[in-house]
C-alpha cells in the first residue's frame, strides 16, 4: 500500500510539474469574476431549456426567504411524494435550469415529482448560507409533504449538501426525510484520502490536488473545517435516515464515499454503497450516458422503491 501511495504521489507531482500546476489551487480575483460571469451566462442560456421543457410538465417557481426553488411535476405521478434534488457544481456554479434535462427525465421516466433549490453560491456566499437555503427548501416541502414522503438527492457538491442538511435539521429540531441519495459526494475537507493520490491526474482530471484549499478559501466562511455542515462525515450520524451512496472506482472522491459508508454502518444506519466501474465523477445527471441509464439509475430507483414501498416500473 505504501509503495502504491508513493508511486501515485510521484505520478501526480510529475503531472503538476509538466502542466505548471502549483500543487494547490490559487484562486485569484480574476478567476472569481470569471466564475460569476460563467454562472450568469449559464443561467441565461438555460432559459430556453425551461421553455422547451414546459411541454407536458408542470413547472412552478417557488420563492424562498433568500433564493428560489422549482417544483417540477406531471399528472399521474404520486402527488404525496417528492424527490428533493440539490444540484452539484463545486459550490461555485450550477442551477436548477442546468439540471432540467435530468429532472424532467426523473419526472417523466422515474415517475416521481421533483423539487430543486437554487442555493446561494460561493464566492459571494459561504457554507452557512448554502445549507440555510437547502433547509428553507426543505421547510417549504414540509408544508406540503410528510417527511416520510421526501427523499433527498444530490451529486458532487449536492451529494455533500444532502448529507450535511440532516445535521442542520437535527440541530433545528426538524423531522428528517425518508432517505438520502448521494452520488459522488465530498464528505469532508480535513484531509485527502488515498483515492486522490491514486486517481487525481490519472483517471480524474476534475477533482485534483488543491481543490480542498480552493473550496475552503471561498466557501468555508467562519465554520471550522470539521463542522458537520461542511464535512458531514465529522458529525453525529446517529439517527440518520437510510442512505444510498455511490462513486466511481476511477474518481478522486471514491474513498470519501467509502469512508461515509463505514461511518454510517458504525452508527447502525441503513446504508448501501455501490462502486461504479469506470464511471466519471457525478454521472447521475448524465442521461445521455448508456451506463448511467442501464447501471446506475436502476440502483437508485431500487433504493427509492424500497424506501417508499412502491412498485418498480
Q: Which sequence ranges carry the predicted segments?
A:
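A glycine/proline-hinged amphipathic helix-loop "lid/cap" segment
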Residues: 1-75, 309-313
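Alpha/beta-hydrolase superfamily serine-hydrolase fold, recognizing
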Residues: 27, 60-70, 74-313
Amino acid at each position: 500500500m505504501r509503495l502504491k501511495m508513493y508511486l501515485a504521489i510521484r505520478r501526480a507531482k510529475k503531472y503538476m510539474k509538466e502542466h505548471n500546476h502549483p500543487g494547490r489551487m490559487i484562486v485569484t480575483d480574476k478567476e472569481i469574476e470569471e466564475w460569476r460571469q460563467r454562472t450568469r451566462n449559464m443561467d441565461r442560456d438555460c432559459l430556453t431549456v425551461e421553455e422547451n421543457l414546459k411541454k407536458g410538465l408542470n413547472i412552478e417557481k417557488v420563492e424562498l426567504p433568500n433564493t428560489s426553488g422549482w417544483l417540477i411535476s406531471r399528472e399521474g405521478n404520486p402527488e404525496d411524494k417528492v424527490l428533493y434534488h440539490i444540484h452539484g457544481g463545486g459550490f461555485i456554479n450550477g442551477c436548477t435550469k442546468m439540471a432540467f434535462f435530468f429532472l424532467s427525465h426523473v419526472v417523466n421516466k422515474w415517475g416521481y415529482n421533483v423539487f430543486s433549490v437554487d442555493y446561494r453560491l460561493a464566492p459571494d456566499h459561504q457554507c452557512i448560507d448554502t445549507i440555510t437555503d437547502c433547509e428553507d427548501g426543505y421547510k417549504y416541502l414540509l408544508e406540503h409533504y410528510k417527511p416520510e414522503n421526501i427523499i433527498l438527492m444530490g451529486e458532487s457538491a449536492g451529494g455533500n449538501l444532502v448529507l450535511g442538511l440532516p445535521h442542520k435539521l437535527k440541530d433545528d429540531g426538524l423531522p428528517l426525510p425518508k432517505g438520502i441519495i448521494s452520488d459522488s459526494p465530498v464528505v469532508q475537507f480535513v484531509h485527502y484520502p488515498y483515492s486522490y493520490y491514486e486517481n487525481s491526474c490519472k483517471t480524474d482530471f476534475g477533482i485534483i490536488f488543491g481543490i480542498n484549499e480552493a473550496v475552503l478559501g471561498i466557501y468555508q466562511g467562519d465554520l471550522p473545517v470539521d463542522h458537520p455542515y461542511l464535512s458531514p462525515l465529522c458529525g453525529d450520524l446517529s439517527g440518520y435516515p437510510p442512505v444510498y451512496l455511490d462513486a466511481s472506482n476511477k474518481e478522486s472522491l471514491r474513498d470519501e464515499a467509502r469512508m461515509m459508508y463505514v461511518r454510517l454502518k458504525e452508527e447502525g444506519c441503513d446504508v448501501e454503497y455501490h462502486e461504479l466501474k469506470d464511471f466519471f465523477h457525478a454521472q447521475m445527471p448524465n442521461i445521455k450516458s448508456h451506463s448511467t441509464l442501464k447501471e446506475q439509475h436502476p440502483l437508485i430507483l431500487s433504493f427509492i422503491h424500497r424506501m417508499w414501498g412502491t412498485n418498480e416500473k
